[in-house]
Amino acid sequence: MSETTETQNTAGLKLNGLFAFKEGMATIYNENGEAVPVTVLRYEPWFVSQIKTNEADGYEAIQVACHPKKAKNSNKAEKGHLEKAGFENGAQFVKELRQAAPEGTVVGAQISIDSLAKGDFVKITSKSKGKGFAGSVKRWGFAGGPASHGSKFHRRPGSSGNRTWPGRVMPGKKFPGHLGAETVTVKNVEVVQIIAEENVLMVKGPVPGARNTLVKLVRE
């Protein structure tokens, strides 16, 4: 690894977390020769776009942005807000990390991949795979009805009614509907490896979502 490449990827602002994109799963081997299943995450340059404070915003956070937009896809307000961060036409992703800004933090600073280190345990938040419309058996794990002996009740939800009161189906009742595509959080996930020169992070086990899903990692 050249000195220039190392500086480019590791220099920058270190926060208590970062955002990355899911690539897929792989298997690596640790020092004891044991196979470890990992999810490979692709890190791309994120820049500070706003510093939020208790006085001005009511809470402390660092807003970060990534992926420049095309001019035709952005509006004037977006351009004005993100121009100082280096995004003339806005950004595809604008997210926040809830923490106080480290000393010396300025708008436009790049977030370092070294915000996390090997051995850290993180809380991961991402969007699960969408599976379309699903019945109550697949979506909620309903047992279903008899499979044979003349039964005509197999995978239907069954009765959803109540009594004279309330005389309606209560909100939140488990019914068929859209499965997946929900925000999912997984805690205590170990960072197995960070390859700064390739902008790659590896975390132990699976991570919710399809390939290229945006993943938020926050140190616990």
From Swiss-Prot:
Source organism of this protein record: Bdellovibrio bacteriovorus (strain ATCC 15356 / DSM 50701 / NCIMB 9529 / HD100)
Gene Ontology terms for molecular function: rRNA binding; structural constituent of ribosome
Task of the protein: One of the primary rRNA binding proteins, it binds directly near the 3'-end of the 23S rRNA, where it nucleates assembly of the 50S subunit.
Pfam families with a match to the protein in the record: Ribosomal_L3
GO biological process: translation
Source organism superkingdom: Bacteria
Family statement drawn from the similarity comment of this UniProt entry: Belongs to the universal ribosomal protein uL3 family.
Annotated Gene Ontology cellular component terms: cytosolic large ribosomal subunit
Signal peptide (residue range): none
Start and end residues of each stretch annotated as Disordered: 145-169
Name of this chain's protein: Large ribosomal subunit protein uL3
Taxonomy of the source species: Bacteria, Pseudomonadati, Bdellovibrionota, Bdellovibrionia, Bdellovibrionales
SUPFAM superfamilies recorded: Translation proteins
